[in-house]
């Protein structure tokens, strides 16, 4: 009789849990199926009066869509050593999960073999960058502007007097050709490479002038920090701890979401978050995320919402949990860039 009662109680709990889950799912889908006019008006008003809101909306309009172009993926893959990449993924050490190993190999290949860092461009006459001195900025040519270049850095060689141009291209396909740049160019092209491999990725923007990527690890069931400049995988602490970088806002952008992930990265040296009301920032990121998901099937929209909830719990823990720093990642200061450049940016670990 006791066994029967226990079984009956278990069945009741299971039915109640299933009913509750279905009710929760219906509520989630109802809330994410359409945009209320009041929310649209609130967003428009927020953008009118707040500079950071305007900047985030502008980033959303670009970063959430520029990497979602199937026509580019074949061009990208044709430019890479796929045989070598896949061979090392199959044979080499790394994470247990295949996709995580692939991301780690792409980080290695991109930094060690494919892309180069540019503090200063080479002098065309002398063939070296040692005597290049920054002399300001110029306007992009018509050809440079075709590739979303809005700024051209100018350098004069102190030996021969020649002036070199360093166009800051924002078109990732152009970067596939030039294969050089600083953190903006590195992140831009690496993001396109990740998407070309079908890897779910986010472009992660820091208000204090750094950018990197995140990938969703199906094995770890969470978003993982990825920085191609540093060849860094799942080391979100490196900016606050290793670089000693002061930061305020970190926002991640993808074709499916806009998310404030500051808690994941800012564990020390927190700058004041006084550029926007926290409630307004939370509203804005959720509103932009809702816009990105409106046309998705119900099941996908619900799955993404559940992932959001799990990430929110993870981020809440990131603020208070002690930061564990792997010994291999303990080097002080940023690895990419010249010593002077890193010191000027406050990223040298001092």
From Swiss-Prot:
* Residues annotated as the enzyme's active site: 183 (nucleophile), 210, 227
Its Gene Ontology cellular component terms are: cytosol; nucleus; PNGase complex
User: Where does it mainly reside?
Assistant: cytoplasm
> Which keywords does this chain's UniProt record carry?
Cytoplasm, Hydrolase, Metal-binding, Zinc
- Return one Gene Ontology term, BP aspect: protein quality control for misfolded or incompletely synthesized proteins
The cofactors named for this UniProt entry are: Zn(2+)
The protein's GO terms of the molecular function aspect are: metal ion binding; peptide-N4-(N-acetyl-beta-glucosaminyl)asparagine amidase activity
Any note on cofactor binding?
Binds 1 zinc ion per subunit.
Locate the compositionally biased regions of type Basic and acidic residues.
340-350
Q: What does it do? A: Specifically deglycosylates the denatured form of N-linked glycoproteins in the cytoplasm and assists their proteasome-mediated degradation. Cleaves the beta-aspartyl-glucosamine (GlcNAc) of the glycan and the amide side chain of Asn, converting Asn to Asp. Prefers proteins containing high-mannose over those bearing complex type oligosaccharides. Can recognize misfolded proteins in the endoplasmic reticulum that are exported to the cytosol to be destroyed and deglycosylate them, while it has no activity toward native proteins.
The protein here is known as: Peptide-N(4)-(N-acetyl-beta-glucosaminyl)asparagine amidase
Q: Record the organism.
A: Eremothecium gossypii (strain ATCC 10895 / CBS 109.51 / FGSC 9923 / NRRL Y-1056)
The gene designation is: PNG1
């Amino acid at each position: 009789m006791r066994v029967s009662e226990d079984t009956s109680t278990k069945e009741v709990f299971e039915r109640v849990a299933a009913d509750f889950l279905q009710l929760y799912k219906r509520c989630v889908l109802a809330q994410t199926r359409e945009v209320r006019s009041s929310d649209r008006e609130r967003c428009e008003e927020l953008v009118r009066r707040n500079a950071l809101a305007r900047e985030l909306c502008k980033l959303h309009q670009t970063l959430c869509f520029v990497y979602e172009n199937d026509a580019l993926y074949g061009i990208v893959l044709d430019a890479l050593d796929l045989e070598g990449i896949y061979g090392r993924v199959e044979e080499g050490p790394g994470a247990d999960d295949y996709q995580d190993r692939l991301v780690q190999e792409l980080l290695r290949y991109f930094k060690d073999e494919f892309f180069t860092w540019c503090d200063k461009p080479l002098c065309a006459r002398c063939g070296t960058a040692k005597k290049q001195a920054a002399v300001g900025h110029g306007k992009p040519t018509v050809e440079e502007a075709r590739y979303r270049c809005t700024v051209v850095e100018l350098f004069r060689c102190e030996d021969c007097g020649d002036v070199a141009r360093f166009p800051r291209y924002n078109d990732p396909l152009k970067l596939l050709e030039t294969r050089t740049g600083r953190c903006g160019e590195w992140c831009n092209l690496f993001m396109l490479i990740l998407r070309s491999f079908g890897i779910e990725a986010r472009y992660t923007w820091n208000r204090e002038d750094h950018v990197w990527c995140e990938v969703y690890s199906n094995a770890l069931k969470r978003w993982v920090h990825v920085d191609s400049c540093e060849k860094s995988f799942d080391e979100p602490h490196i900016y606050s701890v290793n670089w000693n970088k002061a930061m305020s806002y970190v926002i991640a952008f993808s074709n499916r979401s806009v998310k404030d992930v500051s808690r994941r990265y800012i564990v020390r040296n927190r700058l004041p978050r006084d550029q926007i009301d926290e409630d307004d920032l939370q509203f804005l990121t959720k509103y932009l995320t809702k816009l990105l998901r409106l046309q998705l099937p119900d099941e996908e929209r619900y799955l993404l919402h559940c992932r959001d909830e799990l990430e929110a719990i993870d981020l809440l823990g990131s603020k208070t949990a002690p930061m564990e720093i792997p010994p291999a990642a303990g080097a002080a200061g940023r690895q990419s860039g010249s010593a002077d450049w890193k010191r000027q940016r406050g990223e040298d670990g001092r």
